[in-house]
């Protein structure tokens, strides 16, 4: 009688069930808003012109992206919008535009030709 292969299969099934439960538990713990989960969260610190810095937390899911940062101590939640190039986030009066490792923050209440609120922001490791 061959009980070893059956026992090995039973162990494999138990292991897969455990891994599946762990993955489901991780997805359930991922931050989210109204049922939209963001399994990919990363923080990036930028060094900008004038010695200014900006810390941004990016929340990514397959269909939704958001960025959270603070301006004058107040949190800004910006969501991704259509962009011809790079990633563009808009929240409140601010627009955060990134391309590669560089970003620019604009205050949309200022004139269109006004200097950015933060310019030449470079991601720091």
Curated annotation (Swiss-Prot):
Residue numbers with lipid attached (S-diacylglycerol cysteine): 22
Presence of the UniProt keyword Kinase in the record: no
Entry GO terms, CC: cell outer membrane
Lipid attachment residues per UniProt (N-palmitoyl cysteine): 22
The entry's keywords: Cell outer membrane, Disulfide bond, Lipoprotein, Membrane, Palmitate, Signal
Site feature location: Directly involved in lysozyme active site inhibition: 85, 99
S-S pairs: 48-121
Keyword Lipoprotein applies: yes
Signal peptide region: 1-21
PROSITE patterns the UniProt entry points to: PROKAR_LIPOPROTEIN (PS51257)
Membrane-protein topology: Lipid-anchor
Subcellular location field: Cell outer membrane
Pfam short name (any one): MliC
Quaternary structure annotation from Swiss-Prot or TrEMBL: Homodimer.
Annotated family: Belongs to the MliC family. Type 2 subfamily.
Protein role: Specifically inhibits C-type lysozymes.
Protein name listed in UniProt: Membrane-bound lysozyme inhibitor of C-type lysozyme
